């Protein structure tokens, strides 16, 4: 029986495409939440609670693995805030960790409840998963490398800023990370 990975894709992502497809190609079964359809219709708080419930009910063991990408990582970080520190392994790729602005592209994004996450981190009350790492591209304008570095430093989380990569980390880089992380 294949090990099941709990996967949270970025906004508008499906479990069986892109990274989910690669995880299945490597022999894993995928569970989690596509960020489309019925799940996407839920309020942010209900999405977060649904993920927290999923983790408590089916993925709360030491060998459990969670992979989250972009906005899926933001959802995970908020779900984790409702739970004790996760005891399995967590991999966050191009994680959205708060609001961002890019003057060059004239784009900005303020995700829901950024103040909740920030306050928990700043007060030392965020329940840090036991085994977590984050990877972000140095040229990522959606997942600010500076914000990922600040979060990683404050919480003592391993992070990597990947030179010359943007929000969509290259398949070659992600493949190398998965080769090591999935062991």
Task: Kindly label every feature range from the protein language model.
Residues 141-147, 170:
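Conserved alpha/beta-hydrolase "acid-adjacent" motif
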Residues 30-31, 149, 153-168:
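Catalytic histidine neighborhood in serine/cysteine hydrolases
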Residues 67-77:
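Gly/Ala-rich beta-loop-alpha elbow adjacent to hydrolase catalytic centers
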Residues 35-38, 91-100:
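Active-site nucleophile loop of the alpha/beta-hydrolase fold
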Residues 44-47, 95-122, 173-174:
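Flexible "cap/lid" loop of the alpha/beta hydrolase fold
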Residues 127-129, 133-136:
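Short beta-strand/loop motif that positions the catalytic acidic residue
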Residues 41-42, 165-176:
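Catalytic histidine-centered segment of alpha/beta-hydrolase-like enzymes
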Residues 2-61:
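Active-site catalytic motif of lipid deacylating hydrolases and related acyltransferases
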């Amino acid at each position: 029986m294949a090990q099941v990975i709990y996967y949270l894709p970025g906004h508008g992502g499906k479990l069986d495409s892109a990274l989910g497809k690669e995880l299945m190609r490597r022999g894993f079964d995928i569970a989690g939440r596509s960020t489309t359809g019925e799940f996407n219709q839920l309020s942010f708080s209900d999405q977060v609670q649904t993920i927290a419930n999923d983790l408590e009910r089916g993925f709360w063991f030491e060998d459990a693995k969670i992979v989250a990408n972009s906005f899926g990582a933001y959802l995970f970080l908020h779900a984790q805030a409702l739970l004790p520190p996760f005891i399995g392994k967590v991999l966050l790729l191009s994680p959205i960790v708060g609001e961002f602005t890019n003057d060059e592209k004239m784009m900005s994004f303020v995700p829901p409840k950024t103040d909740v996450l920030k306050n928990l981190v700043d007060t030392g009350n965020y329940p840090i998963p036991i085994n977590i790492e984050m990877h972000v591209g140095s040229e990522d304008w959606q997942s600010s490398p500076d914000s990922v570095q600040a979060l990683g430093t404050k919480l003592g989380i391993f992070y990597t800023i990947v030179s010359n990569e943007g929000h969509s980390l290259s398949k070659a880089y992600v493949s190398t990370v998965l080769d090591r992380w999935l062991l």
